């Protein structure tokens, strides 16, 4: 320190002499471009070099305030000089005050040089004054802090030589609360060294915080504000900290989907056959449902053409073909039986139920055959569709119609060329995709079967099937009406389902629904079918639900919700794991 002392003495002496000729204004001064009124004639004007040197080197060789000039050459403003006859070397840390003394008074004895110098090495004393005291302590904005009572600041930030590097001073308690409300940003906090931040303000007891953390940048006048403000500020910070955790929980609450279906189910069970209001509501619901089906049919007709309704489909296996032989072979194939076995394994249905589900697919095939026979002008319709497809296309557009092969497993269209098809069959994407698609079909087949059995029309049919009757005989005397209904049902299914198979299934389900909807729904509600009896009427009504499920679980759920409105979901079907 000898070299540093000599160097500092000479540098400061020169600086002080240079400033002697300058007019010093100890009133309101400007520091860093900001006008500040420091009250008791505190340091103003250009900040002298000695304040920087005192900060950097922590000079403590001279106790300012007693020389001929008000400020010694090696110190900035020392608040103790304005306090009267106090000991200049009394503890600025407040250790000599009775209510706060813990170490036996001031730095007398062995603490006079060693301990104080060790603290001064951090540049915080400035001859007992605070490195932040001069520019910050007497601000107009803090009238409550005008009374300096000797508790000067010692901060871990004071070692920064440049005032611009210092964060806004705050107290030792964190959250913007100064430790000395009656003084400046108080209390010579040296908790950065792990020691006690002495002085929590007069009347607050002499217990200091240990190891508290500074939170610079938050300034609050706690002398002029009530304690509620302090609490509000702290609480505001807590709220901000907690918000990120509340948001995910809020979104998580929206997850449960069982609430809506349960409400619908309870509403569907409550109405009775004799209640006219419920009947009117049921009619309105049916009309709204049919209107949706019509719109879906129009949409699907534009998308796929009218020919899609002429295809034979298996709702469980997602199989589609335009040839009767192909569908007959499929219904007798091992793959179709494997799908039914998977459904039985997942849902634990009885054999009677599985036979009924199979008969529903057979009946669907028969209905499509009848529709084809009645549509004698099918070829003409196809030609018209072809014209519509190429409408507006001219030679200048260089467009032509070609055939393509659609791969459902990969969701791609392949040119109808032998080489292209063979190349796709051998591609790794197709080999991997077909396995995943097969598993997807199995999962969706369970949902399809469940939704079919939850349909009230299907439940009524199942009851007749269990009794040994033919549940599909009703269609014979009203085939025309049923066909129209089926078409509408198909529309409903087609809308949610991009695949044509699903659309056909829905058409059949709705077809049956229009013919028997009102009567069967009432019967089912009266009967209150339980157990397998709830499976009534799976036939065509079930197909509608099936189609929705073919495209995915989401679509299936939509179909189930619509059916739940009209039916009592009594069927004791064990939901598959996928659900």
Swiss-Prot record:
Keywords: Acetylation, Activator, DNA-binding, Isopeptide bond, Metal-binding, Methylation, mRNA processing, mRNA splicing, Nucleus, Phosphoprotein, Repeat, Transcription, Transcription regulation, Ubl conjugation, Zinc, Zinc-finger. There is a cross-link at residues 140, 240, 247, 254, 264, 401, 459, 467 (Glycyl lysine isopeptide (Lys-Gly) (interchain with G-Cter in SUMO2)). The modification Phosphoserine is found at residues 48, 56, 63, 69, 81-82, 91, 106, 114, 118, 121, 137, 212, 249, 270. It is found in: Nucleus matrix. A motif (Bipartite nuclear localization signal) lies at residues 238-260. Residues 154-194, 243-302, 472-579 are annotated as: Disordered. The modification Omega-N-methylarginine is found at residues 173, 235. Pfam families: AKAP95. Residues 530-545 have a biased composition (Gly residues). One of its GO terms (molecular function) is zinc ion binding. Residues 272-290 have a biased composition (Basic and acidic residues). It comes from the Eukaryota. GO terms for biological process: mRNA processing; regulation of DNA-templated transcription elongation; regulation of RNA splicing; RNA splicing. Residues 483-523 have a biased composition (Acidic residues). Residues 1-124 are annotated as: Mediates transcriptional activation. The modification Phosphothreonine is found at residue 251. Component of the DBIRD complex. Interacts with CCAR2; the interaction is direct. This is DBIRD complex subunit ZNF326. It comes from Pongo abelii.
């Amino acid at each position: 320190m000898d070299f540093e002392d000599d160097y500092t003495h000479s540098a400061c002496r020169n600086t002080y002499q240079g400033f002697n000729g300058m007019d010093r204004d100890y009133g309101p001064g400007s520091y860093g471009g900001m006008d500040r009124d420091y009250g008791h004639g505190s340091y103003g004007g250009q900040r002298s070099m000695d304040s920087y040197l005192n900060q950097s080197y922590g000079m403590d060789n001279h106790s300012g305030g007693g020389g001929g000039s008000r400020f010694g050459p090696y110190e900035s403003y020392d608040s103790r000089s304005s306090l009267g006859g106090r000991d200049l070397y009394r503890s600025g840390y407040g250790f000599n005050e009775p209510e706060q003394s813990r170490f036996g008074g001031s730095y007398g004895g062995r603490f006079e040089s060693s301990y104080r110098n060790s603290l001064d090495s951090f540049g915080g004393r400035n001859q007992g004054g605070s490195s932040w005291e001069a520019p910050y302590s007497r601000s107009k904005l803090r009238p409550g802090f005008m009374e300096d009572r000797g508790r000067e600041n010692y901060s871990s930030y004071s070692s920064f030589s440049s005032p611009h590097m210092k964060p806004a001073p705050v107290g030792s308690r964190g959250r913007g609360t100064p430790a000395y409300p009656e003084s400046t940003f108080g209390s010579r906090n040296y908790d950065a060294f792990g020691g006690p931040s002495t002085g929590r303000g007069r009347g607050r007891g002499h217990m200091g915080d240990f190891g508290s953390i500074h939170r610079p940048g938050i300034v609050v006048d706690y002398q002029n504000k009530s304690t509620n403000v302090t609490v509000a500020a702290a609480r505001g910070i807590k709220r901000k900290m907690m918000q990120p955790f509340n948001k995910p929980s809020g979104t998580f609450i929206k997850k449960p989907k069982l609430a809506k279906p349960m409400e619908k189910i309870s509403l569907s069970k409550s109405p009775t056959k004799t209640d006219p209001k419920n009947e009117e509501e049921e009619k309105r619901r049916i009309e709204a449902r049919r209107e949706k089906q019509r719109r879906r049919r129009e949409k699907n007709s534009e998308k796929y053409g009218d020919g899609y309704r002429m295809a034979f489909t298996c709702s469980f296996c997602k199989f589609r073909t335009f040839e009767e032989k192909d569908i007959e072979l499929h219904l007798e194939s091992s793959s179709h039986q494997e799908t039914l076995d998977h459904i039985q394994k997942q849902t634990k249905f009885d054999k009677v139920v599985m036979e009924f589900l199979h008969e529903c697919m057979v009946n669907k095939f028969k209905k499509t055959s009848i529709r084809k026979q009645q549509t004698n002008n099918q070829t003409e319709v196809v030609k018209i569709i072809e014209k519509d497809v190429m409408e507006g296309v001219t030679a200048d557009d260089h467009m032509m119609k070609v055939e393509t092969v659609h791969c459902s497993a990969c969701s791609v269209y392949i040119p109808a060329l032998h080489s292209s098809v063979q190349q796709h069959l051998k591609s790794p994407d197709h080999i991997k995709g077909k396995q995943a698609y097969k598993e997807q079909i199995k999962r969706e087949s369970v949902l399809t079967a469940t939704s079919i059995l939850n349909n009230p029309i299907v439940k009524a049919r199942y009851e007749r099937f269990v009794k040994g009757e033919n549940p599909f005989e009703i269609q014979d005397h009203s085939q025309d009406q049923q066909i129209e209904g089926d078409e509408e049902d198909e529309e409903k299914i087609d809308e949610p389902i991009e695949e044509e198979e699903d659309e056909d299934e829905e058409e059949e389900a709705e077809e049956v629904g229009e013919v028997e909807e009102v009567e069967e729904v009432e019967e089912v509600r009266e009967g209150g079918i339980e157990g397998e009896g709830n499976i009534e009427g799976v036939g065509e009504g079930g197909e509608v639900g099936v189609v929705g499920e073919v495209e995915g679980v989401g679509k299936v759920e939509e179909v189930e919700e619509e059916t739940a409105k009209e039916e009592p979901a009594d069927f004791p079907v064990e939901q598959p794991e996928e659900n």
